[in-house]
Amino acid sequence: MSNRMVCREASHAGSWYTASGSQLNAQLEGWLSQAQSIAGPARAIIAPHAGYTYCGACAAHAYKQVDPSITRRVFILGPSHHVPLSRCALSPAEVYRTPLYDLRIDQKVYADLWKTGMFERMSLQTDEDEHSIEMHLPYTAKAMENHKDEFSIVPVLVGALSGSKEQEYGKLLSKYLADPSNLFIISPDFCHWGQRFRYTYYDESQGEIYRSIEHLDKMGMGIIEQLDPISFSNYLKKYHNTICGRHPIGVLLNAVAELKKNGIDMNFSFLNYAQSSQCRNWSDSSVSYAAGALIVH
C-alpha cells in the first residue's frame, strides 16, 4: 500500500463560497455565461480572491478567456495574508480538494522549483488558512471540467518580495510562461479603502470617494497594461494603493519583461472592474476587484 496522499481541504467552502458542488457549479456557470470571450486564449489572467458573493461575477471575465483544450498546467500565484514570508512557498499537499473535484499538484514542476533553492515549504495549516489561492480552485476546476484528468496545478504562495526578488522569480517563471500549455493565474484584490484598512486616500477632484478609489485603481490597471514592472513599482510607491497581490503582479510583470527581451509580443487588457460597495463617507469601507487577461501573439 502506498502512503495516503496529503490533501489540502477546501477550508473556505461553506463560508467564502458554497460547499455544495451542484450549487457552486450553477453559480459559476451563471457568472461565466454573463462574460464575453475576447481575443484569446489567455496565457495569464488576473482575477480577485474575495468571497464569491462579492467578486464571483468579476472573476468570470478573466476565466472566460481560458482555453481548456490547450491548458495542461495551471500556475496559481497568490499573496500571503497570514504568515510573514520574504520568499515564495510551495504547498506540502499533493491534492487540493474542491466541491467540484480534486485538483492534482504537478510534482515534477514542484521538484524543479524546489531544486532552485528559492522556495520554502509552507505547512498544511498555513496552506489551509490562506484563501488567496483557494478562491481560484473552483473556477479553475470549472474552466477545465472537460479536461479534468489532463491537467495539474502549481500553487505558489508569494511573500512580501523586494523588487529584485520579484525580478528573480519573474525570470525563473518566464520559461513556464513561454509555454502555451501553461496558464498563470495571478490573485490580487485591488484597493482596500477605509479606516479599518488604514488607507483613506481621497482625491476630491474625482467627486465621491468611490469615484476617487476607481480612478486610483484604474490608474494602476493602466500601468499594469503597459507591462512595465518599474512603472508599477513607482505607482505603488507614490500612492501606496493597498493592492494585496502587488507581489504576484510584480512577478508576472517581470516574467513578461524577460520574454519581451526575447522578442515575444504580448498585451494585457483588463475586462472588468467592481467594488464591494460604494464609499461615500469616511466611515465606509470597500475592496475593489479587477479581472484581465494576458494574450501572447
UniProtKB/Swiss-Prot annotation:
The lineage of its organism: Eukaryota, Metazoa, Chordata, Craniata, Vertebrata. It comes from the Eukaryota. Belongs to the MEMO1 family. PANTHER family: PROTEIN MEMO1. InterPro entries: MEMO1_fam. Interacts with ERBB2. It comes from Danio rerio (Zebrafish). May control cell migration by relaying extracellular chemotactic signals to the microtubule cytoskeleton. Mediator of ERBB2 signaling. Pfam families: Memo. The gene is memo1. This is Protein MEMO1.
